[in-house]
Amino acid sequence: MGYRKLGRTSSQRKALLRDLATDLIVHERIETTEARAKEIRKVVEKLITSGKKGDLHARRQAAAFIRHEVVEVVQVDAKGKDGSTVKKNRPVYALQKLFDDVAPRYAERQGGYTRILKKGPRRGDGAPMVIIELV
């Protein structure tokens, strides 16, 4: 099965797909061109399917592809040096969100985790724009 070159070298294309796939996992909805969205769809579907497996190998493969990006910062209780309870900020990363939040949501679903909605042409160059989102 072929793929789109997206007018870039292979390393640039891989970086673009990594960035867009990570952004889709973090925000669960992004706006991009139609060609890019169709390529991201392939990547994200495979990432979510491996996230559903949840084993160490799947986690390492996903970690090799997804950017190490902070999704949010949550406060957790932790023990201080004197034994008291203190609040600490702990970051939640994109990989953690994929395995703990996104993948379990689709446990009963056999593929088709994304939806592409056509938006219309971009004003500057007329490129067909779409919104890709997690179902």
Swiss-Prot record:
GO cellular component: cytosolic large ribosomal subunit
Keywords: Ribonucleoprotein, Ribosomal protein
Superkingdom as given in the UniProt entry: Bacteria
Keyword Ribonucleoprotein: yes
KW Calcium (keyword) present: no
Gene Ontology molecular function: structural constituent of ribosome
HAMAP family to which the protein is assigned, alphabetical: Ribosomal_bL17 (MF_01368)
Subunit structure: Part of the 50S ribosomal subunit. Contacts protein L32.
Family under the similarity heading: Belongs to the bacterial ribosomal protein bL17 family.
Name of this chain's protein: Large ribosomal subunit protein bL17
Lineage: Bacteria, Bacillati, Bacillota, Bacilli, Bacillales
